[in-house]
């Protein structure tokens, strides 16, 4: 049976593990090393210096690559992965199409680092037709689907076709869905980026990033960028990520189920003005989400009546932490407008469903809504 014929939990549990060998551990531990023994030529061994490579990186890169369907390069943060994709690929006169309602750090790189170098930056909403229309002459398109925090969905295959017709490439931020919820490379994307800080690691205790591609030359350039810039992951953190992958399918299944159930429940609450979730049948991009996603992820967006009302709600929660980021086993929520980087209402709440029991989460939210 091929790997892709196996179920998601089986693939996640076995991802990146070495072949069974008598007397060796089932799961390899972290390799803590700066220099490695290297006699003779610089390429006489697979590892020579810790900034260029580490067996623990190799193991987790192999694991993510198996889930993503590509060759993966690990980075010390999601933004390091973003910069490794964007900065070497774009120069004066090139055109970058980037969604305006995705992760604000990406927009910051485009606006503050690429545009001053002569890159033409086109900001567009996460809408398939708008993105396709903006792709004329594009060198690279960057989309995030579902977008964060508004949870809009772009048709990856349609955007890939449009940018490829211009001779460009498509990169997809797949952080929210993870490779078990969506496989952008299979849909035609050239690169799939992950902030492994979030659902991929899932315990809110790591800051890491990864990029998967199918072009070996691009993978080599990503590794060179990582080494030259020092944007590396610590081996212990890389090992923790690999360890966390074994439970990814279980976590994602519970979190996605909780998120959809809460979205349906919140729609019936009189205190809630609006609910956003790609799994809802009346979501404007629901049909696209059903077609290209295997699960809809842990996020729910909903709007309360103003900033003060939203803050009272957050203050009244007991099980749910008020914190940024998302995708962890602990449910979190925040009022996104406090950052000033997202075009959302003052009372918009980004809620990340964790692995708690649904009834307990509903009771916590109900009390905070009623008392706030």
Region locations from a protein language model:
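A generic secondary-structure signal marking the coil-to-beta-strand transition
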Residues: 9, 26-30, 45, 71, ...
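Conserved PLP-enzyme active-site core in the AAT-like
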Residues: 2-4, 18, 72-268
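PLP-dependent enzyme catalytic core of the Aspartate aminotransferase-like
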Residues: 111, 121-122, 251, 315, ...
């Amino acid at each position: 049976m091929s790997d892709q014929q196996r179920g998601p939990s089986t693939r996640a549990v076995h991802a990146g593990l070495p072949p069974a060998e008598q007397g060796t551990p089932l799961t390899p531990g972290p390799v803590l090393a700066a220099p490695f023994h290297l006699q003779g030529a610089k390429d006489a061994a697979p590892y020579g210096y810790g900034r260029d490579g580490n067996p623990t990186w190799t193991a987790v890169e192999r694991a993510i690559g198996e889930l993503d369907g590509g060759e993966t390069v690990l980075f010390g943060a999601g933004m390091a992965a973003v910069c490794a994709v964007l900065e070497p690929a774009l120069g004066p006169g090139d055109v970058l199409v980037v969604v305006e309602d995705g992760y604000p750090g990406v927009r910051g790189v485009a606006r503050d680092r690429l545009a001053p170098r002569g890159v033409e930056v086109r900001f567009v909403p996460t809408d398939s037709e708008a993105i396709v229309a903006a792709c004329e002459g594009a060198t690279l398109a960057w989309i995030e689907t579902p977008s964060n925090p508004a949870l809009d969905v772009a048709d990856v295959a349609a955007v890939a076709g449009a940018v490829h017709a211009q001779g460009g490439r498509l990169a997809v931020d797949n952080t929210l869905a993870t490779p078990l919820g969506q496989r952008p490379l299979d849909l035609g994307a050239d690169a799939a980026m992950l902030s492994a800080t979030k659902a991929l690691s899932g315990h809110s205790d790591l800051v890491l990033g990864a990029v998967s591609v199918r072009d070996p030359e691009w993978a080599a350039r990503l590794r060179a960028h990582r080494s030259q810039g020092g944007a590396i992951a610590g081996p212990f953190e890389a090992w923790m990520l690999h360890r966390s992958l074994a439970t990814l399918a279980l976590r994602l299944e519970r979190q996605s189920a909780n998120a959809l159930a809460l979205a349906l429940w919140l729609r019936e609450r009189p205190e809630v003005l609006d609910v956003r979730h790609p799994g809802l049948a009346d979501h404007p991009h629901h049909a696209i989400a059903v077609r290209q996603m295997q699960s809809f992820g842990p996020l729910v967006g909903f709007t309360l009546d103003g900033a003060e009302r939203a803050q009272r709600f957050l203050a009244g929660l007991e099980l749910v932490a008020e914190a940024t980021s998302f995708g962890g086993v602990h449910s979190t929520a925040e009022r996104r407008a406090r950052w000033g980087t997202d075009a959302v209402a003052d009372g918009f709440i980004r809620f990340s469903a964790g692995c708690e029991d649904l009834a307990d989460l509903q009771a916590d939210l109900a009390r905070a809504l009623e008392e706030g």
